[in-house]
Amino acid sequence: DPLFPDKKVVNIFCEPSTRTKISFEIAASNLGCQIIDFDVSSSSLEKGESLKDTIDNFAKMNINLCILRHKDSVIHELIDQTDSMVFISGGEGSISHPSQGLLDIMTVRHKKDLDNSNILIVGDLDHSRVFQSFIDGMANFDSKITLCGPKELCKDVIDSSNLDYEEDLNKALKGQDVVMALRIQHERFEEKKNLDK
């Protein structure tokens, strides 16, 4: 029997997604929820309606849960706006992606001890929401985390983090139990960088 047949769920993805969006749809379906098919590109958001107004309308339609992905950090404002709808973050710009961070931590836990592992994170650290959420979650454990990547893609993290940084990938790989590779977030750059080095 469905657990929540009377609950309505809407996914609002203002940035592209495949795995996160479909995973949330499958989870809602498995729980017996009614899934509202919402396509941002064919919605009133495209005609200039604010996200706040869209959410307000959904709340009036008795939608219970909104999974939201947005380029900006807006979810806290929306939570303050309505008490009749629950929100889950599907990712906010380069700020956070809590569900992916949790999945990554559980993946490491499946193979390694979260308190005694050497973990290397390689790639575009300054623009990765996945990196931010993984680091936030791993702060609860006693693993040694090393960062690696081109300095022009890691400068903000290097300046603000107390984690070890090694620019040379071959050196950074030595002694690691886990390597987390992050893609370059081309969509977050205002101008194209030369990253073919």
Go through each PLM region and give its residues:
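P-loop/Walker A phosphate-binding loop and immediately adjacent motor/lid segment at beta-alpha junctions
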Residues: 84-86, 118, 146-148, 193-197
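Phosphate/diphosphate ligand-binding glycine-rich loop within oxidoreductases
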Residues: 2-109
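Glycine-rich phosphate/diphosphate-binding loop of Rossmann-like nucleotide-binding domains
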Residues: 14-26, 109-182, 187
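Charged helix-capping and loop-helix junction motifs
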Residues: 49-53, 163-164, 194-197
